[in-house]
Structure formats: structure tokens, C-alpha cells
């Protein structure tokens, strides 16, 4: 509505003054004026395609329904299993992550029984084929309970399958980010580090540079091994996606403790996010909007009421005053979306000054 546009316009004006942004708002009624431009939503689905087409974007600039069907299949969590096999059979050092399988409702492992679950002495986790940001997970830490059984039954009924994997002894999360041009070339964009809760749900990103990530990872694995993992992943992704997908994609990874062999190893294929993702956002923020050497967090918070959000927003503005120099955040709290009297969520960064 008009009120929302006013808040967005005011917020954009403020950001333009702080960061010299060469951007402007486009409302839905204005879409016909941009009918021949490339549309880059966070991710694609039939509803977004229909909305863009109805709004006036030319059909030639939108993915076809058939392309969306193929995109959906390529975005399934089960695709990570092929990458697990690749790393396993090539015996890439300092990697882990085996013991995972796809459970399908076509006669192959359709009945998940306690005997199967008992293979995983430390517990296991079931993952929906389509979800993200730590959602669509069912943790099985204390045996095959009725709740777990019901979850598996629903997943088989709704999606015809799910992924089953052991619970790894995770130390930290990170990701490698890439861009596919859709014409055969897949480029490495950078790294991101993120934080999850004990149930695997996304809680935020650590704002840090690629150089800082490469320094951080060396406390766990040698840098040469890390580069080999990155190169192997880039080559595998290029083979799988570079001609059939255009856009950003991220591969979630984790550092894990090991009981045998090296003390630590990298699980390099936890999840493949075939879309724009929080890691890309945090990488862009670190590269272009945070002072070099600055560190902080990029987070998304939800609140039960807009009053609770407004109270916390005002408190953070006072506790962490924003300092911007030469178009980059030196320190402080910066909301990344307008916080209005009706808001119940916020996306923001909080940066600490570089020493």
C-alpha cells in the first residue's frame, strides 16, 4: 500500500545518503516499464513466475514451466548424495560425510524401522527433499518414536522420499558460494560462515572476509586440503549445473570432529542451495559495506508483536550507534529493512570496530 511504499522510500533515501547507492524502488504497477529486463528473485517457483507475467514482465525473460520443474528437481536435497559419492570414491583427504542415504516410496527402504535407525549409534536426522535454512528436519536422537515415525510417513506421502543421515559431531558451519552463468561457466564467489541452533535452524551469518575464513579454517585442516575440496566442489557443480541453471548457489559445509584419522574433517556437501542465499548477502555486505577488518553478525529476528520489535530496535540503535565512514560501516547497528509500526521481523547487521 501507499504507507508501505512511503516507509520503503524513506528507508532507501537514508541508505542512499549513507552508502551512495545507485538504486531505486520499483512498485508492481511499474513492472511494465521494466518488461524487458532480467528478473532475479530470491528463488523461483510457479507462483512468482505467474505474478511477474501478470505484472507485465515479458515471458521470454521468465523461466518456462518445464524449466521450473527441472529446477525443482535439481534443488532437492537428494542431489547432495551424488556429491558425497564423488568425494568418497575419489578419497579426498580431510573430508567426511558418508553414511547418508535416500529413502524412497517406490519399494526401496520404504519402511523405516528401529533396526535401520539403530545403525546410527549417535542418532540420525531425516531431511525433507525440499526445504531450507535448517527447516524440514526431524531429529532422531532417542530412538524411533511415534513422532519420528509419523514424520517419515508424511514425508513419503508428500514428497515420495527423504534423506537420512547420521548426526555428525559438528564444530562449526560455513559455506562456499558460487555463480553459474547458465552457459557452461561456474565461478567461485567466496565463503560465508553462519550459525545454527541445536536443531539445525539458521540463526545468522558471521560477517567476515574470505581471507579471514581461510585463516580460520586452518585451525582444523591444512589450507592445501581446503583448496582441493573447493576445487573439487567447483568442478562437480560446473558439471551438474553450469548449463542448466543461471544464478547464485551455495553449498553448506561443516567442520566435524572425528574419532579416527584426522582430529577434524570437512563435510563438504551438507546441502546445496540452488538460489540466492544468506551467505551471498553476508559476503556482499562484508566486501562492499563493512570497513576492511570489521567483524559482526548478520541476523534475522522475529518478534511476537510489533511493539516488542520496536522496543528492541530503539534499544539497539541507542546501545550500538551506527558509524559510517566513506560509505562503509565502521561499527554499530544497521537495519537492512524498514522497521515500521507494523513490523514483526527485522534483518540487520551489528558490526564491531576493527582493532
Predicted regions and their residues:
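Glycine-rich phosphate-binding loop of ATP-grasp-fold ATP-dependent ligases
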Residues: 123-149, 175, 198-217
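A long amphipathic alpha-helix within ATP-dependent nucleotide-binding catalytic cores
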Residues: 202-264, 303-327
Amino acid at each position: 500500500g501507499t504507507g508501505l511504499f512511503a516507509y520503503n522510500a524513506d528507508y532507501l533515501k537514508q541508505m542512499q545518503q549513507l552508502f551512495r547507492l545507485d538504486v531505486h524502488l520499483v512498485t508492481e504497477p511499474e513492472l511494465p516499464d521494466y518488461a524487458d529486463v532480467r528478473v532475479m528473485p530470491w528463488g523461483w517457483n510457479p507462483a512468482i513466475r505467474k505474478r511477474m507475467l501478470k505484472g507485465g514482465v515479458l515471458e521470454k525473460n521468465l523461466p518456462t514451466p518445464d524449466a521450473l520443474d527441472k529446477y525443482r528437481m535439481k534443488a532437492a536435497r537428494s542431489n547432495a548424495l551424488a556429491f558425497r559419492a564423488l568425494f568418497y570414491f575419489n578419497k579426498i583427504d580431510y573430508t567426511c560425510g558418508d553414511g547418508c542415504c535416500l529413502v524412497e516410496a517406490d519399494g526401496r527402504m520404504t519402511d523405516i524401522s528401529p533396526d535401520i535407525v539403530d545403525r546410527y549409534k549417535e542418532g540420525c536426522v531425516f531431511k525433507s527433499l525440499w526445504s531450507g535454512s535448517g527447516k524440514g528436519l526431524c531429529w532422531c536422537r532417542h530412538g524411533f518414536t511415534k513422532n519420528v515415525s509419523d514424520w517419515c510417513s508424511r514425508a513419503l506421502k508428500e514428497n515420495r522420499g527423504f534423506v537420512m543421515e547420521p548426526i555428525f559431531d559438528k564444530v562449526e558451519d560455513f559455506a562456499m558460494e558460487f555463480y553459474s552463468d547458465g552457459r557452461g561457466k561456474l565461478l567461485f564467489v567466496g565463503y560465508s560462515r553462519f550459525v545454527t541452533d541445536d536443531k539445525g535452524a539458521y540463526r545468522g551469518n558471521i560477517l567476515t572476509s574470505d581471507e579471514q575464513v581461510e585463516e580460520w579454517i586452518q585451525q582444523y585442516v591444512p589450507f592445501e586440503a581446503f583448496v582441493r575440496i573447493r576445487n573439487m566442489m567447483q568442478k562437480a557443480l560446473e558439471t551438474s549445473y553450469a548449463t542448466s541453471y543461471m544464478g547464485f548457489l551455495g553449498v553448506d559445509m561443516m567442520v566435524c570432529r572425528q574419532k579416527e584419522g584426522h582430529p577434524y574433517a570437512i563435510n563438504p556437501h551438507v546441502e546445496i542451495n540452488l538460489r540466492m542465499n544468506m551467505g551471498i548477502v553476508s559476503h556482499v555486505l562484508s566486501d562492499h559495506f563493512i570497513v576492511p577488518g570489521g567483524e559482526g553478525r548478520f541476523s534475522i529476528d522475529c518478534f511476537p508483536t510489533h511493539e516488542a520489535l520496536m522496543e528492541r530496535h530503539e534499544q539497539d540503535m541507542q546501545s550500538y550507534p551506527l558509524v559510517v565512514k566513506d560509505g562503509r560501516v565502521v561499527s554499530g547497528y544497521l537495519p537492512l529493512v524498514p522497521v515500521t509500526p507494523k513490523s514483526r521481523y527485522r534483518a540487520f547487521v551489528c558490526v564491531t570496530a576493527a582493532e
